Amino acid sequence: MNIERADFVDRVKIFVKAGDGGNGCVSFRREKYVPKGGPDGGDGGNGGFVFLRANPSVSTLIEFVNKRKFMAENGKHGMGKKMKGRNGKDLFIDVPVGTVVKDAVTGEVIADLNEPGKIVCVARGGRGGRGNAHFATSIKQAPLIAERGEKGESRWLELELKILADVGLVGYPNVGKSSLISRISNARPKIANYPFTTLIPNLGVVKYDDFSFVVADIPGLIEGASEGVGLGNVFLRHVERCYLIAHVIDVSGYEREDPVRDYFVIREEMKKYSPFLLEKPEIVVANKIDLIGKEELEKILKRLRDATNREVIPVSAVTGEGIDLLVSKLASIVREMKVEKPERKEEKFVKPSPVWRRLPEKFHLEVVKEDEGYWVVEGENLRVWIERFDLNQRDARLMLLQVLEKNGLNNKLKEAGVKEGDVVRIGDFEFEYRE
């Protein structure tokens, strides 16, 4: 997988908004020879949901650089003859496999889309409002009331791509990681004799007998990466999913003087990023052995083994010496770890229910004086009622006033000092107070 730096984006923020539910309809049956037909207002359709879907054909998050807002379709309003409005179309947003989805405000991890086809709902659509056919009773046979649709959910999300690879190559810049991955796999990264040639992670598939695994070439780290020196440690997140870390060390002495020090500097930067990385299995790859004498090489390899307490495999990415042993070792470790990993049970995706807030029967009311002779009735749960119904509809007003009276509205108005003739506002509806 070769991607230009400008095309590789592994962290973005996007805004998602699910569709609102359609409004219910106030309608009455009108047919020839049926002079007084009953209510037949249909329900509104549900708003569309927003889903994220892991798509293996998507490699980076670059599609979200220029487009950051995604909105699903609203539900259609209900109609007469008990016709339900059409549901809004769900919106599916494809992201790379390995994308971690977080709430951008709280930082909560919503989902880890680490398998092809995995889906997560990130915003639920609002339920459609009920038409007046639902409000008919033996006493009220022609109700002038219908519900508004519920608002769909909205939120800011942070998408973070963590590449899925079995082996992660880490080390200083210019130690030969790119040459190594091009030697052992089908990857063909840019290779040059200067630091930071690799600016993005490169992936390569390695085949060993009947077994294959994926290796990631992580851009070089240097001392101070955790403070943003060089390319920083922004790419270390791609190592988090690897089974095995292959720590590449330049033992030639031409560009790096002390391979043991180099090893521990990189380990310290990994620790600062996440101590969890130090718990991963690791082998040390001593590269560029073609540039050093055999006797000197043996001394360096012994120092590395004694200091790191790791298996050290000497190789030359240029001549190919030691490559077969390295591939065999990597394949053996990865194969063993994949067998040990318990099989995941396939999770069947179930679409959640649309947003629908239950109307509270009892709630606190507050009467606020806005001007001389002008008062406003407020309350958190009162707002839910006001959003649910159109108070221009006669029966909606009567129903709400009955609920408010049960919650002591009249006493609240008197306690606040409302006088006869004063104007009281509830939502967008105003009325003149009478004792």
UniProtKB/Swiss-Prot annotation:
Binding site for GTP: 171-178, 196-200, 217-220, 287-290, 316-318
Principal place of residence: cytoplasm
The keyword Nucleotide-binding belongs to this UniProt entry's keyword annotation: yes
Residues of the Obg domain: 6-164
UniProt-listed Enzyme Commission number(s): 3.6.5.-
GO MF term set: GTP binding; GTPase activity; magnesium ion binding
Xref: InterPro entries: G_OBG, GTP-bd, GTP-bd_Obg/CgtA, GTP-bd_prot_GTP1/OBG_C_sf, GTP1-OBG_CS, GTP1_OBG_dom, GTP1_OBG_dom_sf, OBG_GTPase
Residues reported to bind Mg(2+): 178, 198
Single Gene Ontology BP annotation: ribosome biogenesis
Function: An essential GTPase which binds GTP, GDP and possibly (p)ppGpp with moderate affinity, with high nucleotide exchange rates and a fairly low GTP hydrolysis rate. Plays a role in control of the cell cycle, stress response, ribosome biogenesis and in those bacteria that undergo differentiation, in morphogenesis control.
Subunit annotation: Monomer.
Protein name (database record): GTPase Obg
UniProt source species: Thermotoga maritima (strain ATCC 43589 / DSM 3109 / JCM 10099 / NBRC 100826 / MSB8)
